[in-house]
Amino acid sequence: MIIGFVGFGEAAAAIAEGLHEEGAEDLICFDAMQNDLRFTEKLAAKRAKANAARKETSAEVCREADVVISAVPSGFALSAAKEAVPGLTAGTIYVDVSTATPAEKKRIAVLVEEKGGRFVDGAMMGTLLKDRHQVPTLCCGSGATEYLEKMAPYHMRLT
């Protein structure tokens, strides 16, 4: 299973690192700042620590991944989805773990589901940098049950 990340800042990198340690082998990611010289080294180090392959666009992540975790600042969640979702293939699970508003999450869900994907709103309820991939996360949406099943081998704390 390929797990992709849209956004690879502190949250995504922490989750990816934990997943890698649990045995996830196929991790891919895109970050909008990856070509900004101020961030290239830091992002490269995070990718290396999680053994995550860099992709050139978020749409490429959606095209290749079975599960996509979008971990961008809340103000960018909808615009990130609009850029990523055109690459989505039917059956892909798109998980938004941002703190975007309910109205924005609904818009993202519509975008995902119109492409044949399944949406998950993931509300992280703990200390992410400490708990990493095991941060307690409340999940809802059309893809929630399947997301819990797919991620079970990685000992995430999803409900």
Regions found by a protein language model. Give the residues of each.
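Short low-complexity, flexible loop/linker segments enriched in glycine and/or proline
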Residues: L43-A44, A71, Q134-T137
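Rossmann-fold NAD(P) dinucleotide-binding segment
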Residues: A59-F119
